A protein has these predicted regions:
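Beta-rich accessory regions
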Residues: 5-28, 43-49, 108-170
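Acidic-and-aromatic substrate-binding clefts and catalytic sites of carbohydrate-active enzymes
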Residues: 75, 106-108
């Protein structure tokens, strides 16, 4: 994977490319919706757009229960539901950047949210509560005894030692 320095110009270029790609009209392709939602989540300031993209999927007539999804009339696939689940998880918890980002997306629809025992890369189990768009608390358990950098949008970054509960009220 190439690791380019992210600049405002690069973000703008990526956003313009993504907007062009999604401008071709509605689609019933769930994987395109999942990919668009995840890509929008990676661009600063596009929280609402990412949530809007993700919500397009829930009304698809070809999205069934569990992992049933049909790209066409007779072709069941399972990638799209898993992609949509990943996009939803990215809204709550991201750990693919080398940090653990808790509630990286802030959208009005998730004004009050919580999750318990979600897995993060590096052998971490994370639980957290968001109330009125403010992070109330985060609990991290390191299954391997590792340390991590916790990033919470409305807190200053916190270095976390194994088995520590981080709480900030205010």
């Amino acid at each position: 994977m190439m690791d380019h320095e992210i600049t405002p110009e690069l973000d703008a270029f990526i956003a313009a490319s993504l907007d062009h790609w999604t401008s071709f009209g509605p689609t019933d392709n769930g994987f395109s919706i999942a990919a668009s939602a995840i890509m929008n989540q990676m661009i600063p300031g596009r929280d609402a757009r990412a949530w809007s993209e993700l919500n397009k999927a829930w009304g698809l007539p070809n999205l069934g229960k569990a992992t049933f999804y049909w790209e066409s009339d007779h072709c069941p696939v399972n990638e799209s539901p898993f992609g949509l689940a990943a996009a939803l998880q990215y809204t709550l918890l991201r750990s693919d950047t080398g940090n653990i980002d808790v509630f990286p997306q802030r959208v009005e629809a998730l004004r009050n949210a919580s999750f318990a025992l979600m897995r993060a890369e590096g052998g971490f189990v994370v639980s957290a509560v968001l109330k009125e768009l403010r992070t109330q608390w985060v609990e991290i358990e390191s299954l391997l005894g590792n340390e991590c950098l916790l990033r919470v949008r409305d807190w200053t970054d916190v270095a976390v030692a194994p088995s520590v509960v981080v709480e900030k009220r205010g």
